[in-house]
Amino acid sequence: MQLVIAEKPSVGIALAKALGVTEKKDGYIEGNGYIVSWCVGHLVSLANADMYDEKFKKWNIADLPIIPDEWQFIIAEDKDKQFGILRQLMDDNRVTEVVNACDAGREGELIFRLVYNKALCNKPIKRLWISSMEEKAIRDGFDNLKDGKDYENLYQSALCRAKADWIVGINATRLFSKLYNRTLNVGRVQTPTLAMLYERENSISNFPKEKYFNVHLKSVGLDAVHEKVKEQGEAENIRRDCDGNEAIVKSVKTERKTVNPPHLYDLTTLQREANRLYGFTAQQTLDYTQSLYEMKLVTYPRTDSQYITDDMSDTAKNIAESVAGKLPHFSSVVIAPETKRVINNKKVSDHHAIIPTSEVSSTDLSSVPDGERKILYLIANRLLCATNEPYIYETVTAEISCSGYSFVAKGRNVISEGWKAIEKAFIDFQKCKDYTEEEEETLSLTEGQVIERPVSEVSEHFTQPPKHFTEDTLLSAMERAGTDEITEEVERSGLGTPATRASIIEKLTKSGFIKREKKNLVVTDYGTDLISVMPDIIKSASMTADWENALSLMAQGKFTSQQFMVDIEKLVDDIITVAKETIDESKVSRNGGEVIGTCPRCGKNVVVTPKAYSCEDRNCGFVIWKNDKFFEKARKPLTKEMATNLIKYGRIAVKGLYSEKSDRNYDATVCLDDTGKYVNYKLEFAPKKKKK
């Protein structure tokens, strides 16, 4: 008899149904040669530090690093009953094999193995590895169970990831919390992610906003532009010279462009698209997709592949055709799926791309909850787009001369809509208000053509800072480990995995390090305080991505767990050494907070607090508020570096201050004007150069 252990009850029940197991017991189902039971998420986890030694209940820098010689594991307090049931079932003499039917991925392997090992079971392990919860897929999976030994490397990878998070989290959190006298939660992956968000906020805050002007030359079906004139007066002169005067088309260049269909979804690209179109968080999308998977409507969600295998070609084509017939908005679109471009056996390892299942054709989609239904439509639409023809168009660039000035007009002529027709039909059907795509107008001009009496206008613009991260763009940055470019040929590593990135974002939010402002993710004062004191060694996105890559190689048997743990332990030693070398007592206030200078009033420390830079002696009262109205009106955020220099020198040179009166930016020296009761500011300007 086989004991089948699923990751959670709902999956266990679905497996039992597919196997014809019907006799319900307390915590399991029995019959037809099987016992089907389940975990409830993580039943067993790594023990806390104080389980190794009572002294670790108190946080002391002298005790660091804390690195267990022999790792201990504990049963979750509220889950001991289910663990007891599983242990009893494993001991059952009727059971000859244990089938690991937990999630077919790294975390599912860990959940099962920790329970199996904690129960001291030594019976043979078989592995169920499926990408669909359809009953046929389940039965096929049981007909082709894998040897559990084949997944030993995956287990070691999962266990090392858990140990690394434990070691870095406990040691770094205790170290920096004690150094700065306040709780600073540090994580192996979450801290580099927070650092990326912080750097983006800094780029936005310090962006030198500059005004410029465009001069337009307009006629019927034409809007040519002379771009980025710095001075308004110069732009007005161009406008006056050109307005109503004859213009001539000097040249017309055309270029044919082909845009291939998008890839099928992996989890990350699905999360990004759902955030962009619907505003769903990464966690919401994962939850909805997991629900659809358990409803047998889509394939396995936690995948990093955007392709299917060649043996799935006919199935994918049939599903695409049935999905197209199921969704009314495709009635006016030609559907002729071609799967050749979505097949790549080399780029499918554990699981293929997320696609709908054949169950969709026989399901009443109106009964599917709204969130899940939107994700299902998104996945179905992507399958149809990915298997359609390329989008082909022609760009047109015309150079136009008027009164000695050069203007450029751009347009686009569509040759074949291809997959774009499907996407547009989908967007209209879903009424995605936030969906935007720049589309150039059709342009029809010939070289030498004369444009009579065009109208000339001036438009005002500002250079734009980088945009705040959304979950869409943050997921992309995490996938790329903070770098800007990644090619199709390079194997992707990154911060976290497709399965864990959503939880990292949620953890940063729940910990108060970041907050959501509509779709934007913004670093809080608490997050700023944490990152501002972290050494580069723990903020490095690329280094953390290297660890993730090592874990991936370990799962493939190409990197040893022993070497990984040696490297992680060295990392912790380096973090502690660097922190002790760079942060001494002069940098830490007895009352908590990083010291940035000496109070100009009383000579005591000025420390960083969530809302200000203030004297540690409350009786002194010296404080520089982070949201001071002077800097808010000037649209120039007061950074820690600016506050440090104000305190040290009494003045700072600042570029790009904003004047409400003139609606212009200017440069000036901001001087600290401390009355002894209030901190004010005054401006000094460099003397104007005399004209010779």
Question: Which sequence ranges carry the predicted segments?
Answer:
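Conserved short loop/turn motifs at secondary-structure junctions
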Residues: 1, 101-104, 181-183, 254-263, ...
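Intrinsically disordered, low-complexity regulatory segments
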Residues: 1-162, 166, 464-465
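Basic, low-complexity terminal or inter-domain segments flanking catalytic cores
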Residues: 2-3, 79, 90, 96, ...
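Amphipathic alpha-helical transducer elements in NTP-driven molecular machines
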Residues: 9-16, 33-36, 40, 76-87, ...
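Short, polar/flexible loop-turn hinges at active-site or ligand-entry regions and domain interfaces
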Residues: 71-74, 102, 122-126, 147-154, ...
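C-terminal or mid-to-C-terminal helical accessory/interaction module adjacent to the motor/catalytic core
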Residues: 93, 137-219, 254-258
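Metal- or metallocofactor-binding catalytic centers and their adjacent structured scaffolds
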Residues: 232-265, 271, 542
